Amino acid sequence: MSMTLSENRGPNRLAFLRAAFRRPAGAIAGGYIVLLILGAVFAPLLTPYAYDVQSLKDAFQPPSAAHLLGTDEFGRDLLTRLLYGARTSLSVSSISILISVMAGMTLGAAAGYFGGFFDRAVTAVADLTWSFPEILIALILVAIIGPGVSGTMAAIAVAYLAQFARLTRAQIMMLKGETFIEASRSLGSGHAHIIFRHLLPNALAPVLVSAMLATGDAIILEATLGFFGLGAQPPTPSWGAMMSSGSALLFKAPWIIIFPGLAVATTVIAINLFGDALIAALDIRDRLRRDE
């Protein structure tokens, strides 16, 4: 009976994702995110220009039919660099958060399940890390590792590790006393089977929502590091680096900084709106489960 309870939760585990897309704000925000990802992936097919080819005679061209978003100080098409910059910003932020989620969930699950000294150690380190702003942690790590995509990804992953470890630990502490866990244990299931087959899948939904919201913060963090020259290095475009080069040309060619800034702002807003839709869908799911 208890095992049946565990299995019944499985098929509906990610049903709240579909529920989020049924909400108007979730559908609009989710649609924007999907279009942005498609634009980044198929950038070579959407623009005839190369992101790294300079043409000084075309420098500082305002938005026109030939260059929809204008050109930068080196004559490079801004729309092209914006699309390729989306590749950098989205991939760095999403992969970093994915690494952070995987590591944080593993540590948090082990700490919450086994308890004892390991739990106290993980909690102490997580609390210490949690007390510092993510940007400070990222700046310190990038200074140690060095600038570039790899350093930025490592810095962002470590900066958000404590968030997912704490959240997962709390979920595991709440779930490990459930009847289906006791039933699985009484049937002779090992610790690894219980953690990875029963506990982590049922703790995934709130972690997924938190990861979605953290991805928006990670995009801002990646753009900040790029603005200071600590992110992706030239000629690889990134939204932060584009804003950095455009900041000195605000009055001469404002479009160079405006469009990357709008890209960051609209993307983060869309991610947050979709995250809010996920939270609302998750609340409804939990309320229905409590009423059963």
Spell out what each predicted region is:
Residues 68, 72, 78, 102-104, ...:
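Generic hydrophobic transmembrane alpha-helix motif, especially the helices
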Residues 1-31, 273-292:
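Transmembrane alpha-helical segments of polytopic membrane transport and secretion proteins
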Residues 2, 31, 35, 39-74, ...:
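Hydrophobic alpha-helical transmembrane segments of membrane transport/permease proteins
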Residues 141-145, 171-172, 213, 221-264, ...:
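Glycine-rich helix-loop "coupling/hinge" segments at transmembrane-helix boundaries
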Residues 31-50, 85, 124-147, 157, ...:
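Membrane-water interface segments at the C-terminal ends of transmembrane alpha-helices
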Residues 78-113:
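Transmembrane alpha-helix signature in integral membrane proteins
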Residues 159, 205-215, 254-292:
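C-terminal transmembrane helix and the adjacent membrane-cytosol boundary/short C-terminal tail
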